């Protein structure tokens, strides 16, 4: 009986080209499998980065929060960051652009992924930060830090038209979504908000990031938000989860399953190629040995 294992070993030694072909097949398979793994990791990272860019990295939001509740919330044991936002008014321009005037603290900017091109948050009453799209829409495209601009906005509380001169303290990068929707931002100082508003009647949107670093589900985050709302005396109808951000933290099963399927195809194809190389080589040798036996060669020969 012919020992096919020995024949295979001898065949590998005698036929370097076949051995090299097998090695190349294994190397290519390994490279392709590694590429799939890298693609899956990069796809997940890109999805997360893109979501944070457009949806922020806060886990939830509490709306209609008064100043006293906001103070309690900022010191809550379950909360790491609270971004405060108070809408003041909006300027509507003839080209259908809208410029939202609002107070936002540093954490609110951070949690909503605002990026400074230059400058800093306003501290004085007459200072303001605008995104580059707002400056362009207002006709102040070439204005820079320290220069004066005028804004005429409709006050949300009394619907009065208010004109105010501000000094630019910072310029924000305009997102693609803001550019497409012609919806821009102007950030006022806390002192301007307090000196022009009746704070006892004002409410805030509070963007929240929890201390808990584990990947919480949407349901778990909603429960935590509702608990916090109850703790500060806020109706739970005012809580909402940033579902886009939470979903981006989870592995994309569609991408993973696609990668696993392609990986299995590569592995099976590689096995088939290597098997065929061995099989064809062994069959050829068996045929050669059969011819030798037919003409009278002994086993030893």
Q: Language-model segments: what does each one mean?
A:
Residues 1-6:
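Short, membrane-interfacial amphipathic segments enriched in basic
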Residues 8-16:
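Short, Lys/Arg-rich N-terminal segment immediately upstream of the first membrane anchor
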Residues 13, 75, 83-86, 278, ...:
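Protein kinase-like catalytic domain
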Residues 16-44, 250-291, 300:
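Hydrophobic alpha-helical transmembrane segments of multi-pass inner-membrane transport and secretion
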Residues 41-243:
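Basic-flanked hydrophobic alpha-helices used for secretion and membrane insertion
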Residues 220-226, 230, 242-259, 264-267:
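Extended helical coiled-coil dimerization/tether regions that scaffold
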């Amino acid at each position: 009986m012919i020992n096919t294992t020995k024949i295979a070993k001898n065949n590998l030694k005698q036929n370097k080209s076949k051995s090299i072909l097998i090695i190349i097949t294994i190397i290519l398979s390994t490279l392709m499998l590694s590429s799939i793994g890298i693609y899956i990791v990069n796809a997940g990272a890109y999805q997360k980065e893109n979501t944070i860019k457009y949806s922020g990295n806060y886990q939830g939001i509490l709306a209609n929060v008064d100043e006293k509740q906001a103070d309690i919330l900022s010191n809550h044991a379950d909360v790491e960051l609270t971004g405060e936002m108070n809408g003041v008014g909006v300027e509507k321009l003839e080209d259908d652009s809208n410029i939202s005037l609002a107070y936002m603290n540093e954490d609110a900017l951070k949690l909503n992924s605002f990026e400074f091109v230059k400058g800093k948050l306003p501290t004085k009453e007459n200072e303001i930060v605008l995104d580059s799209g707002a400056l362009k829409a207002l006709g102040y495209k070439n204005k820079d830090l320290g220069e004066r601009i005028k804004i005429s906005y409709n006050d949300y509380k009394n619907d009065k038209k208010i004109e105010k001169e501000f000094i630019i303290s910072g310029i924000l990068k305009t997102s693609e979504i803001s550019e497409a929707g012609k919806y821009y931002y102007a950030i006022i100082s806390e002192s301007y908000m307090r000196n022009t508003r009746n704070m006892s009647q004002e409410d805030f949107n509070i963007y929240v990031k929890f201390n808990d670093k584990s990947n919480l589900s949407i349901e778990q985050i909603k429960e935590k938000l509702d608990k916090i709302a109850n703790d500060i005396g806020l109706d739970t109808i005012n809580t909402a989860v940033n579902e886009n951000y939470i979903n981006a933290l989870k592995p994309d099963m569609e991408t993973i399953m696609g990668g696993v399927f392609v990986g299995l195809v590569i592995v099976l194809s590689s096995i088939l190629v290597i098997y065929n190389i061995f099989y064809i080589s062994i069959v050829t040798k068996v045929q050669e040995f059969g011819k030798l036996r037919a003409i009278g060669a002994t086993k030893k020969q």
